[in-house]
Curated annotation (Swiss-Prot):
HAMAP family listed in its UniProt record: MinE
The protein, known as: Cell division topological specificity factor
Annotated TM spans: none
Gene3D superfamilies on file: Cell division topological specificity factor MinE
Keyword tags: Cell cycle, Cell division
Statement: the UniProt record of this protein carries the keyword Cell division: yes
Superkingdom of origin: Bacteria
Originating species: Methylocella silvestris (strain DSM 15510 / CIP 108128 / LMG 27833 / NCIMB 13906 / BL2)
Biological process, per Gene Ontology: cell division; regulation of division septum assembly
């Protein structure tokens, strides 16, 4: 170490370069999250659809990125068994009503 270099100010270029690297890395992570969230959403929809009769638009996936932590929030609207049965019964009732209305009048009166 040279005696004259002891009193010399350190160059700010390496510090600025390190800060720029950190900033670029942070931005790349933030930009890449949209792809990650879309991929996660597709996989979550596929897994849930195996077990529950849900529509794709009933599943919402959000990622919030903070300074120290990122949070993945998944909101799923799963129909209760009662709702599924009511829908099935309503469809069956509609089919029966349609079949009854499509019968000829003579057959219904003759029986």
């Amino acid at each position: 170490m040279n005696f004259m270099s002891f009193f010399k100010r350190p160059s700010t270029a390496p510090v600025a370069k390190d800060r720029l690297k950190l900033l670029l890395a942070h931005e790349r992570v933030a930009i890449g999250n949209s792809d990650v969230v879309a991929l996660l959403r597709e996989e979550i929809v596929a897994v849930i659809a195996k077990h529950f009769p849900v529509e794709s638009n009933a599943i919402k996936v959000r990622m919030e990125t903070g300074e120290a932590i990122s949070t993945l929030e998944v909101e799923v609207e799963i129909p209760t068994p009662l709702c599924v049965n009511v829908r099935l019964n309503a469809n069956d009732d509609a089919k029966k009503k349609a079949e009854h209305q499509s019968r000829p009048i003579e057959a219904a009166a003759g029986g």
